[in-house]
Amino acid sequence: MTDLKASSLRALKLMDLTTLNDDDTNEKVIALCHQAKTPVGNTAAICIYPRFIPIARKTLKEQGTPDIRIATVTNFPHGNDDIDIALAETRAAIAYGADEVDVVFPYRALIAGNEQVGFDLVKACKDACAAANVLLKVIIETGELKEEALIRKASEISIKAGADFIKTSTGKVPVNATPESARIMMEVIRDMGVSKTVGFKPAGGVRTAEDAQKFLAIADELFGADWADSRHYRFGASSLLASLLKALGHGDGKSASSY
């Protein structure tokens, strides 16, 4: 197996196959569930809006892939600093049956100098998730934070507040995951000594098998080749799947999605 084939198979099994569009429908989510079951293995999860969780759960069970996890988003995509709303949305997502919640960090508050609200918001959501055995990923929106110091700070605050994963981006801003921001965030995981318990998720902008290979190489360099399993690494993407499947000898690499 070539290096690109090997990394593509790894990446496919680490994907949170995503649809987070305003025009999402039950039919589109059902199609996403079908796509998550591939000829070479299943994606780790799907990521959808909360209202679609019940139909996704039913579809995944019916197609014989109940182990594909269901992730959803809260405080999304703007990362407002209203803790009560973020917590209410997170509790609602848990009630819908989410296995994982990707909450947006109040990044604009951090840019304005307020570190406390980010900690408090993540901690409140973490407490709700922990009580329900739900995984919490925190989206820090690196493309809006821009500066290394802010990316580092948001990562540190999120981890201290209990994040199970730190995630680069919503996919809804001009700049999403980059290798540079990925390295900074994974260096924080390393430097804080939390690589056993905290994972990393690049999202948005990882579109090709070659992109995925680059992002995995950074993880392998920092943590060794065994670290990036589905408990420690995910790709938030949709168009990536077609490229990975093409690299693995399935399909033409074309995707209907841009995330």
UniProtKB/Swiss-Prot annotation:
Q: What does this protein do?
A: Catalyzes a reversible aldol reaction between acetaldehyde and D-glyceraldehyde 3-phosphate to generate 2-deoxy-D-ribose 5-phosphate.
GO CC annotations, alphabetized: cytoplasm
User: Does the UniProt entry include the keyword Lyase?
Assistant: yes
Enzyme Commission identifier(s): 4.1.2.4
Keywords, in A-Z order: Cytoplasm, Lyase, Schiff base
Give the positions the UniProt entry annotates as the active site: D102, K167, K201
Where can this protein be found?
Cytoplasm
What protein name applies here? Deoxyribose-phosphate aldolase
Q: In which pathway does it act?
A: Carbohydrate degradation; 2-deoxy-D-ribose 1-phosphate degradation; D-glyceraldehyde 3-phosphate and acetaldehyde from 2-deoxy-alpha-D-ribose 1-phosphate: step 2/2
Tell whether Glycosyltransferase is among the UniProt keywords. no
Q: Report the Pfam families cross-referenced here.
A: DeoC
GO BP, one example? Answer: deoxyribonucleotide catabolic process
* Superkingdom, natural source: Bacteria
Summarize subunit and interaction data from the UniProt record for this chain: Homodimer.
The first-level EC class reads: lyase
Give the protein family. Answer: Belongs to the DeoC/FbaB aldolase family. DeoC type 2 subfamily.
